[in-house]
Every structure is written in structure tokens, then in C-alpha cells.
């Protein structure tokens, strides 16, 4: 099985058993995090966060660019972080 096929299979299984739909859209901890996209790092585990706790925005080097500013502005202005 190719990596793509495996990822698609896992995504289908995740979607079929997804039980987080009742969580509100604004994050429970009212925080947004910008983190590096380094695949070795788990920002949720690092910060002790669970699904629904925070908006996590990832990019190369955790650099704040115009894209991150836009995402942070939406997170803060519309969703209360």
C-alpha cells in the first residue's frame, strides 16, 4: 500500500469515528499558537493541549508572515483568542 493510500484510509477511518463535532469553534483555552512545521514536534503534547483547546498554526520556522498575521487576526477577532 502506498503512503497516499494509507493516509486516505486513515482519514476515512478518522472521519467515520469523529466525535469532536460538538466542540465549539472558538478554542477552549482561548489561545492561538504559531509553531514550526517540523514533523518531529507535537505542539499539542509539548504544551499539554487537547483537541479543541487552541488554534495551532504551523509553518517553516514558526515565522510570523502576512499569512500568519491573517490567521491570528481571524483567531483573535472572530474566535476570541
Where are these regions (language model features)?
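Divalent metal-coordination and catalytic microenvironments
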Residues: 11, 33, 57
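Short HxH-centered metal-ligating active-site micro-motif
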Residues: 50-81
Amino acid at each position: 500500500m502506498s503512503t497516499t493510500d494509507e493516509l486516505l484510509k486513515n482519514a476515512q477511518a478518522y472521519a467515520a469515528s469523529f466525535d469532536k463535532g460538538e466542540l465549539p469553534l472558538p478554542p477552549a483555552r482561548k489561545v492561538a499558537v504559531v509553531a514550526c512545521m517540523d514533523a518531529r514536534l507535537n505542539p499539542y503534547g509539548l504544551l499539554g493541549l487537547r483537541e479543541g483547546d487552541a488554534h495551532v498554526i504551523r509553518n517553516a520556522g514558526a515565522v510570523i508572515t502576512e499569512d500568519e498575521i491573517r490567521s491570528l487576526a481571524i483567531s483573535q477577532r472572530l474566535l476570541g483568542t
